[in-house]
């Protein structure tokens, strides 16, 4: 019976919470946002998408966000296809 009470309490505490993820935000066609080494631009872009913060990842010269909502679209493994939704 104690296990049932513990599980019920844990379920109530986690109800309504959102998980967060990190990644490259994307626009149409699974295309990431180029940043040209501008950290301020990426931080603003990420916060507009409800992330905690963001920066310009120098290896790819693309914006990378920390703490995006779980429903936010991030870059997958496919190619960028401009013009496709």
From Swiss-Prot:
InterPro entries: LCN-type_CS_alpha_beta_dom, Scorpion_toxin-like, Scorpion_toxin-like_sf, Scorpion_toxinL, Scorpion_toxinL/defensin. GO terms for molecular function: sodium channel inhibitor activity; toxin activity. Expressed by the venom gland. It holds the Pfam family Toxin_3. It is found in: Secreted. Has the structural arrangement of an alpha-helix connected to antiparallel beta-sheets by disulfide bonds (CS-alpha/beta). The modification Proline amide is found at residue 82. SMART domains: Knot1 (SM00505). It comes from the Eukaryota. Belongs to the long (4 C-C) scorpion toxin superfamily. Sodium channel inhibitor family. Alpha subfamily. GO terms for biological process: defense response. Its main location: secreted. GO terms for cellular component: extracellular region. Residues 21-81 form the LCN-type CS-alpha/beta domain. Keywords: Amidation, Disulfide bond, Ion channel impairing toxin, Neurotoxin, Secreted, Signal, Toxin, Voltage-gated sodium channel impairing toxin. Alpha toxins bind voltage-independently at site-3 of sodium channels (Nav) and inhibit the inactivation of the activated channels, thereby blocking neuronal transmission. Residues 1-19 form the signal peptide. This is Toxin TdNa8. Disulfide bonds join 31-80, 35-56, 42-63, 46-65.
């Amino acid at each position: 019976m104690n296990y049932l009470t513990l599980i019920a309490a844990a379920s109530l505490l986690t109800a309504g919470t959102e998980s967060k993820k990190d990644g490259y935000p994307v626009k149409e066609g699974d295309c990431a946002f180029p940043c040209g080494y501008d950290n301020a631009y990426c931080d603003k872009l990420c916060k507009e998408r409800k992330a905690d913060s963001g920066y310009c990842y120098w290896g790819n010269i693309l914006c990378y966000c920390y703490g995006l909502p779980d429903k936010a679209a991030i870059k997958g493994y496919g190619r960028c296809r401009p013009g496709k939704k």
